[in-house]
Amino acid sequence: MLVMAGLGLYDERDVTLKTLDFAKKVDKIYAEFYTAILTGTTMEKIEGTLQKPITVLDREKVEYETNKLIDEAKDKDIMFLTAGDPMVATTHVDIAVEARKKGIEVVIINAPSIYSAIGITGLQLYKFGKTTSIVFPEPNYFPETPYDVIKDNLKLGYHTLCLLDIQADKERFMTANEGLDALLKIEEKRKENVISEETEVAVVARAGSINPGLYYGKIKDLLNYDFKSPLHCVIIPGKLHFMEEDALKYLFENI
């Protein structure tokens, strides 16, 4: 049996009772934290909560040695843990599908993810369009996909959730400041008037924690603002309903 369980967003207290129950029964627990990470806790605390040791797998082992994990689940009960919800990342979906192809029982335990946590903004979830990711620019690598996604969503009046790059192995987490700066750099190159320093955006910091940060304002006023510890994400609002306008006014710190 393969149990795919999410750990939630912030700390070990996000672990569900269902996950705790299955953790007691399984033979071995694996986890990956390269797609996302819980910044409010430590591996020791997670292991203490589950009362079992956890073997952490790096990107290469998850993406290129998936069969080893799946084959082990033929004869043993294996738990695979991820931050957020276990079925958000395409890689995790592939693991579940391949396991089922081999006749292995798959149990999926859902958990809070950024897609549920953005409800804290008061923006209507059904008005979000395609999600995009802003990555750290590298030499000869500066994808403009986020710009195109935002442009297409705005045409339809949709909000855009921009996830920010995580390089957990380097303990490097893109800040909202860096994400906004990247969007302005793409605009400077494309000149299609999708984003400007006058564009009003929302920033969510430490979603899922007891004290998340909610900030709203023009990009020019947010570029040098201290959003404090990660993880951050950026939302480019589309057409706003009056209730959403009230949410941005009263639920957010307006910069």
Swiss-Prot record:
Q: Which GO terms describe its biological process?
A: methylation; protein histidyl modification to diphthamide
Q: How does it assemble?
A: Homodimer.
**Species of provenance:** Methanococcus maripaludis (strain DSM 14266 / JCM 13030 / NBRC 101832 / S2 / LL)
EC number, as in UniProt:
2.1.1.98
Q: Any idea which positions bind S-adenosyl-L-methionine?
A: 9, 85, 88, 113-114, 164, 207, 232
Query: Which catalysed reactions does the entry list for this protein?
Result: 2-[(3S)-amino-3-carboxypropyl]-L-histidyl-[translation elongation factor 2] + 3 S-adenosyl-L-methionine = diphthine-[translation elongation factor 2] + 3 S-adenosyl-L-homocysteine + 3 H(+)
Q: What is this protein called?
A: Diphthine synthase
InterPro entries on file: 4pyrrol_Mease (IPR000878), 4pyrrol_Methylase_sf (IPR035996), 4pyrrole_Mease_sub1 (IPR014777), 4pyrrole_Mease_sub2 (IPR014776), Dphthn_synthase (IPR004551)
| HAMAP family listed in its UniProt record | Diphthine_synth (MF_01084)
Q: Name one GO molecular function term.
A: diphthine synthase activity
State the pathway, as annotated in the record: Protein modification; peptidyl-diphthamide biosynthesis
Q: What does this protein do?
A: S-adenosyl-L-methionine-dependent methyltransferase that catalyzes the trimethylation of the amino group of the modified target histidine residue in translation elongation factor 2 (EF-2), to form an intermediate called diphthine. The three successive methylation reactions represent the second step of diphthamide biosynthesis.
Instruction: Identify its protein family.
Output: Belongs to the diphthine synthase family.
What keywords are annotated for this sequence in UniProt?
Methyltransferase, S-adenosyl-L-methionine, Transferase
